[in-house]
Amino acid sequence: NTPDYDQLQAEEKTVFPTDRPIREIALELSGDMRRYIWGINGRTISQEEKILIRRGDIVRFRLTNGTMMLHPMHLHGHYFRVVNQHGDYSPLKHTVNVSPMQTVTIEFLADEEKDWFFHCHLLYHMLTGMARAISYEGSEPDPDMVAIQKLHLRDMRDNQWFFWGRADVG
């Protein structure tokens, strides 16, 4: 069973300041059971650029799961609102389950800096590419994130059908 986020309600308001710009980003969780390669918007982390965001913006991800598997999506360094029927009292989370063929909307205040990791918490899905680097504009690249992308690209090049990988994620 997956949680019904419409049943969750925060005790206090979780809304962000209304004077901030809102950046909406559509992310389709993709992959299949034949090749067992997972991605976002049909691409793995090594094939895709970082998602650039601006400090101070409200970032809204619309996560659509186009697969037949559950994907618990986790964002490092930020709590996000799971936008639901409770509006101002939508719950705060750092991981959200996106059920098969469903869409969940999350939003967070971009109040950090540098690079942060957004990925499926099913580690094999993460290792095969269902992840993105979220990067604040003007930040220097995080060497650990660059290393993960290079490792994944090398593994995919060496064996296009299946691979064992490793990623250190803090």
Regions found by a protein language model. Give the residues of each.
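Copper-binding active sites and cupredoxin-like electron-transfer domains
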Residues: N1-G170
